UniProtKB/Swiss-Prot annotation:
Post-translational modification: Isoprenylated.
Modified residues (Cysteine methyl ester): 218
Organism annotation: Bos taurus (Bovine)
GO molecular function: G protein activity; GDP binding; GTP binding; GTPase activity
Biological role stated in the UniProt entry: The small GTPases Rab are key regulators of intracellular membrane trafficking, from the formation of transport vesicles to their fusion with membranes. Rabs cycle between an inactive GDP-bound form and an active GTP-bound form that is able to recruit to membranes different sets of downstream effectors directly responsible for vesicle formation, movement, tethering and fusion. RAB28 is required for shedding and phagocytosis of cone cell outer segments (OS) discs in the retina. Also participates in nuclear factor kappa-B p65/RELA nuclear transport in endothelial cells.
Known cofactor(s): Mg(2+)
Protein name according to UniProt: Ras-related protein Rab-28
Region annotated Switch I, chain positions: 35-49
Biological process annotations from GO: vesicle-mediated transport
Amino acids binding GTP: 21, 24-27, 38-39, 41, 44, 71, 129-130, 132, 160-161
GO CC aspect terms: ciliary basal body; ciliary rootlet; cytoplasm; plasma membrane
Record field: catalytic activity: GTP + H2O = GDP + phosphate + H(+)
Subunit annotation: Interacts (prenylated form) with PDE6D; the interaction promotes RAB28 delivery to the photoreceptor outer segments. Interacts with KCNJ13; the interaction may facilitate cone outer segments phagocytosis. Interacts with RELA; the interaction contributes to RELA transport from cytoplasm to nucleus.
Amino acid sequence: MSDSEEESLDRQLKIVVLGDGTSGKTSLATCFAQETFGKQYKQTIGLDFFLRRITLPGSLNVTLQVWDIGGQTIGGKMLDKYIYGAQGVLLVYDVTNYQSFENLEDWYSVVKKVSEESETQPLVALVGNKIDLEHMRTVKPEKHLRFCQENGFSSHFVSAKTGDSVFLCFQKVAAEILGIKLNKAEIEQSQRVVKADIVNYNQEPMSRTVNPPRSSMCAVQ
């Protein structure tokens, strides 16, 4: 295959990640792009930018430009410009924070406004994050699915902390944008391999109960 033919199989997609500041957008983008989870919360101011190249069926190489938009930009003048030209939009909320789910109406209204003013109609995906905290869930799956059905969103549930379904979410979005259907084997192959950190701690007397600090990692195949 010539260089020009190889280049023709390379695609670039702009994926914009929107949602409230505590929904875990940055952790989601970082987990996908760098396969790590940031344990310390750091609010995104304005815009963060991530890149990752993936391969879809048919040996199609796709570079995803992930635009992590700060939660405070919802009323800002730059938000329209950040969204403009996106092929995909992830609306991210925290499944344990009902307000973060309700606020997606405001985020989506901006997406619709930009779409009407541009020639690009992005694929919109609804992403429920922090499913590792299922016992603290306040947004029922039925609510999530109804919102998807009413607006034609694709549906995803992930955990940026454990890495559960993070890569699969981005892979599915990219494939749907490009009109590529993933088969069951490809989906299963993209599922996260569960791993555990080894936590080292000092020896303590047997009479004392030791609760070492818990650690988490994001591992993506």
